Amino acid sequence: MALSFGYLQRDNSFKKDSQECETPRIRKTPVNMYLEKTLSFKDLVDQRNNYRDGNCGVKTRKGINLKGPKPDNMILDRSLSFTSLVQVENRGGEEEDERGSSPKRRNRGNLTALSLPAPTPFWSPRPSTELDAAAVTLQKVYKSYRTRRNLADCAVVVEELWWKELELAKLEPNKTNDKPESAVSRWARAGTKAAKVGKGLLKDDKAQKLALRHWLEAIDPRHRYGHNLHLYYDVWSESESTQPFFFWLDIGDGKEVNLNKCSRTLLQRQCITYLGPKERQAYEVVVEDGKLVSRQTKSLVETTEGTKWIFVLSTTRKLYIGQKQKGRFQHSSFLSGAAITAAGRIVSHDGVVKAVWPYSGHYLPTEENFREFICFLRENHVNLTNVKMNAIDDDDHLVNNDGSTKPSMMVAKSDGSDEQKRFSCKWSTGNGPRIGCVRDYPMDLQTRALEQVNLSPRVVNGTMGLFGPIPSPRPSPKIRVSPRLSCMGLPSPRH
């Protein structure tokens, strides 16, 4: 804390501390006597003898004589601040030289002010305009990620609001009929209400959408592996947190949660790669003379033995083939989570198809999807006589209680087909992932969801306190975005 003092001259004018003047005398009164004893002027005089009052700010004319009838006043000649802290240097020989020098020189001669080191200027060989552009780009990337995280939470909230509306609709009695309403009638009424406000997303009815269990992966800005995300999603659903899921997971109350089944390190490390339009061109494959050829390099497709290679047939009849890397590159990588016509595994040697089967944990293809892919190969004159089509994928097959194994295609047919008919997931476009699914809900639910995550806050009277995000609704512990929804039999807003 800096203290600055001046003093009054004999003509009652204020003299600044940077000028020299004669020491005024103040009449000795009981008040002055009390102040002199209280402030302990003798201690200040001792400090003057030890530190040579150059920059200390204590300066006397004739000394302070408390016994005399008219003691001289003490003059604080400089302001006391952090920058005026001093240390004594070269006290020996310089004292004699300074005794004969001027008062101004004595004040500056033997003491060196302690000052903070000057900041080192940042230097870069790049021009300042380029550095400014880089800073703006970094800010845009961070803001984009924050916005996409909020939109992902918005998608979760609007899904919950949708199920809440359906729950209220099925419990609402029929006002036009006095007879008790049957369960079938209630479900039919809920489906009718859903059909009025819902709309389809894809023109191709045979297209297979991304499985619901990987929905969180698609809308996650980091595209963390959907299976891992659902483990944390279950913890969030069972908690009493009022924060949206992704906010809770990354920076909210759940940022310290670390599960044994999936550690936080594994969750952050296993992020699925989502290809853009230019990136996926390296994986596009065409059929020439019945053989699989890379469209970009014109080389025959050769799947390395001991590794797993996967394929995806888009709704525009484009084939993509690449090597599977668990937790990094999977079926959803090719089209950034968009709908597909067929997906599965493939084995090819020198461009000749040796084996193909429809196993995909992300898309859960059905027999109909597999037939579409077989028709695609036949249309391009691929010889399927010796092609193996009934292999078992060790990652996706299930073991029943009796010990027998069934391929995941049969599981998809029994459990996933109804799920896929009810849910369509247009999570992305050709330019990359986006949250377009929010537009498939009624406008009032969209508005409420945006308000919940504070992306479009409602104007209210008074100031809004900054206490984190608005609570996310949970109509029922059983109603949430998880694989359990596939067994509920409720209609989807997008079907």
Swiss-Prot record:
Keywords: Cytoplasm, Nucleus
Residue ranges of the region described as Disordered: 89-122
Cytoplasm listed as a keyword: yes
Tissues where the protein occurs: Expressed in roots, rosette and cauline leaves, and at lower levels in stems, flowers and siliques.
UniProt subcellular location: Cytoplasm; Nucleus
Boundaries of every IQ domain copy: 131-160
Main location (coarse class): cytoplasm
A GO CC term attached to the entry: cytoplasm
InterPro entries: IQM
Inducers of expression: Down-regulated by salt stress and treatment with mannitol.
Superkingdom field: Eukaryota
PANTHER family xrefs: IQ DOMAIN-CONTAINING PROTEIN IQM3, IQ DOMAIN-CONTAINING PROTEIN IQM5
General function of this protein: May be involved in biotic and abiotic stress responses.
Protein name: IQ domain-containing protein IQM5
Species for this entry: Arabidopsis thaliana (Mouse-ear cress)
Lineage, top ranks: Eukaryota, Viridiplantae, Streptophyta, Embryophyta, Tracheophyta
